[in-house]
Amino acid sequence: KPEKVVATLSSLCVEMDARYELLKAAGVRNIKEYNAKFRKRVLNPEKGHRFMPYIVVIVDEFADLIMTAGKEVETPIARLAQKARAIGIHVILATQRPSANVITGVIKANFPSRMAFKVASGIDSKTILDSTGAQQLIGRGDMLISNNSEIERVQCAFIDTPEVTAICEHIASQPGYPHALILPEPLVSGEGIDGGGEGVPFGDRDPLFEE
């Protein structure tokens, strides 16, 4: 549901701001330096310091989301893409409809690394990469990657369902965290969503969350 997505993105923005405060208090520049200090027991948990896990936010079909939630989704995603990398929060967006009203100027400005498979037209290619060419790809994993205005043509590997299952089983077999990472819960006010609260209770989570 769009409202749940907006709440989650807002929670991640609150988490991002909290992490930057911890970096400032620790006198470090990024998550790698912070966690190194924490492992060496230089940072005191009693003063609010904690180990920071990396978080990857994946939006599978961004077009559906932007059409239903609009600016409510675009603003927090742009904030996270712009500032959150240094504190270990990364955003991946995917869409099958690369139109200008989906991949807006705000989104493009904050996602320097972009990739495109075969698209229907040169306009779609320009929307994603700021350059034509993706409309001439041959398909079957043929793709273009744009990173800081440099475009490279590469072949994406095909992963079938059994291999995906094997990878997921391998990840699931590794030791994990003893408990889920609880994000700060945004509070709904008259002007929208704001940060606050103590976290999302387990009872309010999806029934398949722990799976």
Regions found by a protein language model. Give the residues of each.
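A short, structured beta-strand-centered segment in the mid-to-C-terminal lobe
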Residues: K1-A7
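P-loop NTPase motor-domain active sites and their immediate coupling elements
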Residues: A7-E211
